[in-house]
Amino acid sequence: SQAQMPFADGGMVWLWPQWQSGLLRQNAHDALEADQQAIRLILSDDPQPSPLAYQRMKVNQAHNALFNSLNQAMQEPGFNSHYLADMKLWVTHSQFIVEHINAMTTLAREHTMLTPDLAQRYLQSCEIALQRCQQRLEYDSPGESGDLNILEAPETLTHGPMSTLEQHLQRVLGHLNTMHTISSVAWRQRPHHGVWLTRRLKRTEY
């Protein structure tokens, strides 16, 4: 059918890049959502093995979908190479977060926990950092990102030697801050057509 045929406009093939850009953005958003749900479980009062294992699976599935959509985008015409290079770096940091979540899931299953107050403070910082990254993906112009500048510096959350769980959380926060910076740069080079310009993303529940 005509809808399935790519068409050229000004020397650029549009169909696949426009659909793939929207999918890449959606999958990046969904990966962050899965990360958030996992961290909530890990830092909950009484994390249970089955929900932890299920959410770890969802985190890995979401990242794999993101990785696959990036690979597809890199093979298609019409994409800005600088944008793709930035997104590849973003996805690399996402993979590091997956590895930290995998390790923290094991710790939580072994009942390696933080004090309730410290867990709550880390959860708040992680959620703010995750939401900043999601907002960077959701809004159409740099001035509408709704960035929250109340992210507590990770090093102020604890004093003295850090537990293994805290070290993982610190690194997650570091990756999220880097991802926000990367996507702010990539935003100026994003595709300016098609599905990418859908104003708000649908939310996928994990």
Regions found by a protein language model. Name each.
Residues 22-87, 105-206:
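Long, hydrophobic alpha-helical segments that serve as membrane-spanning/inserting helices
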